[in-house]
Amino acid sequence: MSNGIKVKKRDGSIEPIDLDKMHVMVEAACEGLAGVSASQVEMKSGIQFYDGITTGEIQEILIRAASDLIDLEHPNYQFVAARLLLFSLRKSVYGTKEHPTLEGQILAAVAQKVYDHNIFDKYSLEEIHKVDTYIDHDRDLLFTYAGLRQVVDKYLVQDRSNGQVYETPQFMYIMIALTMFAEYPKETRLSYVKRYYDAISKHKINIPTPIMACLLYTSPSPRDATLSRMPSSA
């Protein structure tokens, strides 16, 4: 459904606003959660549509609306807001709801000069393909809004000058695991990668900021140096 108003998409194209599409997105964010309502989110948003409003602005308004509904009696709105943020993030990073393969993600990020190409020196393509089977993007749904917002704002690889993000949480987690165990024996390291990825992506353990954030230390063993400096770096 459209009321004649035009919206500006992320790629710069202009098209009529699709209120039905927006409703479907909010319904998807509420799916399976008790005590939440898509109509409440839409009413809370109080969106004033105007010609030229961007799809990103619409999504941010909906995210804020859902987060404003979080209270002691309706805690599940924290997951509605998180899902809306996740939908926006995936669309911004990939231009679609579908994720690339791990190899595709690494190649794209290397081309954008935000990942180091030496990951292909450390791991064979066969290993990369094997690790790809470990990734479960549905674990993004475990995030609360506060948790996902912190990850997006602080830890995902991004260009701080313009806010462009280059990865989603599960790729962040698997890249941390791959980097942590790159120097381990090839016979056993993938088992460590999987176990560590499972632990952090299921939020069974929290990663200290020195490992989550980007650091540049001069040391023969960057991983050990990072761990040893945690008290002074945190």
Give names to the regions the model predicted.
Residues M1-S219, R223:
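Extended catalytic cores of very large enzyme megasubunits
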Residues S221-D224, S228-A234:
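Positively charged, low-complexity/disordered segments
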